[in-house]
Amino acid sequence: MARVLIVGAGAAGLMAAGAAVRQGHQVTVLEHTDKPGQKILVTGKGRCNVTNDCPAEEFLRHVRTNPRFLYSSLGAFPPAKTMELFEALGVELKVERGRRVFPVSDKAEEIRQALLRYAQDAEIVYDGAKKLLLEELPPELEAAPAVPENPRHPKKKKAGPALRCVGVRGTSGKEYRADAVLVATGGVSYPTTGSTGDGYRLAQQAGHTLVEPVPSLVSLVSHDPDCKKMMGLALKNVTLTLFEDGKDIFEEQGEMLFTHFGISGPLTLSASSHLGDMKKHTYCAEIRSEERRVGKECRSRWSPYH
């Protein structure tokens, strides 16, 4: 039995805690807010889109950046297993258009409670993670690389001794020691729910290099005043096409919403991950409907997004 310390009691942290407990480990979860799983409650308009009922291969096709990174994870735990897990935890699921999976209750709280039950044998400590506790790794324990080094692209030699993480110092000043430390803090997408970017700071402390984060799954802003006039207009079964410098780079059918600043909704969030550098490219969107009248009106009222 190993002592496992997990930083973050969101969906990932609770899933990891439950899995580690079932492997016989002693698990402690650090959470810097007073309520685990807060961000779950705002996903899917408060309904929580659990997963998509599709093969892992199709799932990966929709990952814009480095999908290979997720091969092993989705291979070991594909969407079907996610559905099986929640059904085993007592959550009745349904599959909607686009193969999106939601709880029948349409309540994200049911998913949060299921994850808390799954991780109930882990200890949740309400304390933040201020600093990783690092120790020098003895030379005899330094593992050989799993993959032979490519002579054409040799890796840079690290300066100084190899280090291993043996715990975390909490914001309270208390030290939490463990045989394994898992960082599951999420990103910086929703600070009010606890996603404040602590994981980036901890990763840097461990010597990792960070790729600059960019916005994704976000609403889009339009500078066309007519767009604001349609605020509150919700569209279903429309096709959204996104153009970059006149070339179509995304097209999908679904739901979207006009807001006081532009467009939002599931379709828009999916399209946003295809956007590049706004300073280097010009973007515009086209909205089409099976009903020609609606499609024509929406197209005439949309302007490029810069």
Descriptions of predicted regions:
Residues 3-29:
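N-terminal Rossmann-like FAD-binding beta1-loop-alpha1 element of flavoenzymes
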Residues 7, 176-189, 256-259:
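Short hydrophobic core segments
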Residues 28, 34-36, 42, 50, ...:
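An anion/pyrophosphate-binding glycine-rich loop and adjacent beta-alpha core
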Residues 32-122:
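Conserved N-terminal/central alpha/beta ligand/cofactor-binding core
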Residues 92-115, 206, 210-231:
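Rossmann-like dinucleotide-binding cores of NAD(P)H-dependent redox enzymes
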Residues 125-164:
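A conserved short coil-to-beta-strand element within the FAD-binding core of flavoproteins
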Residues 171-173, 247:
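Glycine-centered tight beta-turn/hairpin loop motif at sheet-sheet or coil-to-beta transitions
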Residues 180-226:
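Glycine-rich loop(s) and the adjacent beta-strand/alpha-helix scaffold that form part
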